[in-house]
């Protein structure tokens, strides 16, 4: 059921009794959207998030019988660390999503060696313009502070990251709370996606989400809900 919030923000709340059931349901929805995109334009582009939350979802999605050789997988955001780092989202995706049938997908990472994160972001921005836009599916996560992608509340240039009219695809992120510098898709590119899911688990994340959509200071996840032209699909399990 869509739950309309202030300032036009809307979302569909999809609750599940446990995390394995959520993973299977979300994988099915994503697979359906990717299959539809392949039928319509011959390819599909999926952007996923890192962290520990999506591992069961990745495993379920990796076994879905879709034309993975026609799927491009990229990241919503990435730490400025090599894939060999245990904190790398690329490494997480390689180990958990790009397995089974999904081994046939093409993966486009965000991290590469560069003189600095600003140069890496500029290079990524240019390279990603060759992908077929808009994205077909984006799967977001959310931190307890209400951040999503690398839109940290204390990020330098947060207004630029959250500009729905931005023509940038990737921007660098510097935020004290983030640890390493980050690379992230901009809000403008996320909200263009045909299907946007927010995957959260646990009572703490539900509390954080409810706080983000309540009246008061706007958290970054609320910026996505406000700007997206269609309801965001929220998937939650305790």
From Swiss-Prot:
Organism annotation: Mesorhizobium japonicum (strain LMG 29417 / CECT 9101 / MAFF 303099)
GO biological process: carbohydrate metabolic process; pentose-phosphate shunt
EC number: 3.1.1.31
Protein name: 6-phosphogluconolactonase
Pfam family, one: Glucosamine_iso
Family statement: Belongs to the glucosamine/galactosamine-6-phosphate isomerase family. 6-phosphogluconolactonase subfamily.
Keyword flag Cytoplasm: no
Known catalytic reactions: 6-phospho-D-glucono-1,5-lactone + H2O = 6-phospho-D-gluconate + H(+)
Transmembrane segments: none
GO molecular-function term, one example from the UniProt record: 6-phosphogluconolactonase activity
